């Protein structure tokens, strides 16, 4: 399977969001990754539903929505109305994770669970069969452009072992510090989907960068 690429809108030029999304539409990107932050669960505020709704109207790629917020279960219905393909929630933010995953599925979306860098893969043992994707944070969440946390490679390998052992069909997505040096190692370790923000949007030729990531 070709590596999937989900460029992160957080790194886009928000003064020219229209043209940035047109570029994504033209590109070989598989999805568009949308980071929603509340300033409580993570130390930053990004954007909310007015921006999400505007992006959804323009973007022709499936929307991969990542909630870095407290009580993400409160926004399942609004996320469904956007037409989102995937709703990612943090293990650390959900008191009743199994119920939240069920509710996401009942709303007609795929359900992803996200682990912060310090959270072990073992937290997923009793939920791995129920999720469509696991998103591993390879930087501490909240800000783009951070340095890649090196032990993510071993974490991907452990997650791949867990998925293969359980027979789960969950994809492995990586978010943070994805660039030309880390991306091949992540794919070799077992990653299926790469989220790339500044590496794509900060490039002189973002469409070529997306193409190159997909051919790893």
Report residues per predicted region.
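Internal catalytic-core helix/loop-beta-alpha segment
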Residues: 110-114, 118
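Acidic, divalent-metal-coordinating active-site segment for phosphoryl/phosphodiester hydrolysis
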Residues: 177-189
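Generic enzyme active-site microenvironment
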Residues: 33, 173-174
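Glycine-rich beta-strand-to-loop/alpha-helix junction loops that act as flexible
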Residues: 174-177, 195-199
């Amino acid at each position: 399977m070709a590596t999937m690429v989900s460029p992160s809108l957080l790194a886009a030029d928000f003064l020219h969001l229209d043209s940035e999304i047109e570029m994504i539409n033209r590109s070989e990107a598989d999805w568009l990754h949308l980071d929603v932050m509340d300033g409580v669960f993570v130390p930053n505020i990004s954007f909310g539903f007015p921006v999400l709704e505007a992006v959804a109207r323009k973007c022709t790629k499936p929307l991969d929505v990542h909630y870095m917020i407290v009580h993400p279960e409160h926004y399942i219905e609004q996320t469904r109305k956007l037409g989102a393909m995937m709703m990612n929630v943090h293990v650390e933010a959900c008191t009743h994770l199994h119920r939240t995953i069920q509710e996401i599925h009942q709303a007609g979306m795929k359900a992803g669970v996200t682990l912060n860098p310090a959270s072990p893969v073992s937290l997923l043992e009793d939920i791995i069969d129920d999720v469509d994707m696991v998103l591993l944070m390879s930087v501490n969440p909240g800000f783009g452009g951070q340095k890649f946390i090196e032990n993510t490679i071993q974490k991907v390998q452990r997650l791949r072992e867990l998925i293969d052992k359980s027979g789960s069909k969950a994809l492995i997505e990586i978010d943070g510090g994805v660039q030309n040096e880390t991306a091949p190692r992540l794919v070799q370790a077992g990653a299926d989907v790469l989220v790339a923000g500044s590496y794509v949007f900060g490039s002189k030729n973002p469409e070529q960068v997306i193409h190159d990531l997909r051919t790893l």
